[in-house]
Amino acid sequence: MSSTAARPASEGRDDESARVEALIDRARAAMREIAAADQARIDEIVTALAWSLYKPENARRLAELSVEDTGIGNVADKIVKNQRKTFGTLRDLMRARTVGVIENDNGSGIIKYGKPVGVVGAITPSTNPAATPVNKTMMALKGANAIIIAPSPAGWSSTNATVELMRAALEKVAAPIDLVQILPHPVSRNMTRLLMEQVDLVVATGSQNNVRAAYSSGTPAIGVGAGNVPVIIDSNADLNDAAEKILASKTFDNSTSCSSENSLVILDDVYEDAIAALKRVGAYRCNGEEIDLIRERLWVEGHLNRELIAKDADVFAAGVGLEPTAAEARFFLVEEEFDAGSPFADEKLSLVLTVYRARDFDHAVELVKRILDVQGRGHSCGIHTRNLDHPIRLAEEIDVVRVLVNQAHTFGNGGSFNNGLNFTLSMGCGTWGGNSISENLNYRHFINTTHLVTTVAEDKPSEEELFGTYFARYGKD
């Protein structure tokens, strides 16, 4: 047989298996080298990783490469994302203990020790081929773990460049470079499956197919749910402030974020004023014919058209066939009555923002529920309002992990310097979204905890204390 002859499929699979096993062996060897590292040493390593992406020339280079590779998003915003998410995550991590004693007694008689979860397999998306790998790697290595990244095939080149920078950063601080590795090109589904089956923890960000595969791998897994964020503009909202925040959030990186607004629910008594405020900041109000054009071209055979998603507004307008003036817009408003069967009720990954009119706040809440039932349940919703009772009602009634109040959703949902959420690029959506976590992915998900338990003064209440109210009402029979 000549050297150019095709190999049997089984031979290719065996080769992939051997390559994955070799990566895992190197990862475990690297972990052994830092097994005795104290918190200061771990923090030094994490800081080096952060600088590898935060460094201005690196943030720009990887942003340019990401857009070149994937055709998704825009360079200026990816630079911001690369730096902001990395800086915010570093802030969070530098304030946490993860190795050795991480919590001491507090009167409970329990001392907690942080320990690694092991080798982490990280599934990363094409939407963030630099920021997400670094974000997950920082969290994983904060727990003294090693990580192997399985990138989206479309983003492999930029993710590989990111990994090379991280490995160089590790070498600079004399840490084992195999703490961070990447699946070799070309990444196949089989290779990713083998990785998920052999690591100690899988963390999957990206398509729901990837998330389901992670949960089906037989390995402990953390996945994230689908986005499709609905945001209410309330009757007493500051309309100009809301419009500015929606503009900043919706247009950031051309709506690649799962936290980008996908629908607005505007109260009837401020509907036209809110539309006017949105138009002042650059929204384009599509007419019926234009809405039909978008419906026909944004989806191809039921799937989002990759030629139009996450594109600049002028590219989108030309691709859809909108009026020439639409090319000057920042984003596009599509107004319609709610229809669960309409594609506009789904996540659109584009500068298209669906707008619904609500009769009153009760109707607005109902619409948010119905939108999330189509897609995005568990993820998040938002509201612009001066009535603090309304966001409380959303928190009580809507099955989401996050309800954001008067915020640019893309910037607040994954952590911000002016809210209490930790920085992340992976949003857990609870069981509502088919996930194992109902919070932002964070360093705590990358450590095991040993509890050293000593005795304390007995804390045993009487039967009367625990059953008294029940006995008084129902007796002891």
For each of these PLM feature ranges, what is it?
Residues 195-198, 238, 298-306, 417-424:
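Short, surface-exposed amphipathic charged segments that create phosphate/polyanion-binding patches used
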Residues 23-25, 223-225, 253-258, 342-349, ...:
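Short, flexible turn/loop "capping" segments at secondary-structure junctions
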Residues 6-8, 14, 134, 142, ...:
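ALDH superfamily catalytic-core signature
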Residues 36-41, 63, 174-179, 252-258, ...:
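Flexible, glycine/charged-enriched surface loops at secondary-structure junctions
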Residues 2-111, 139, 280:
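N-terminal Rossmann-like NAD(P)+-binding subdomain of aldehyde/semialdehyde dehydrogenases
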Residues 4-7, 35, 322-323, 327-477:
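Conserved C-terminal structural/oligomerization subdomain of aldehyde/semialdehyde dehydrogenase
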Residues 24-31, 35-38, 46-57, 66, ...:
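Structural signal for hydrophobic packing residues in well-ordered secondary-structure cores
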Residues 98-241:
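Rossmann-like NAD(P) dinucleotide-binding subdomain of oxidoreductase/dehydrogenase enzymes
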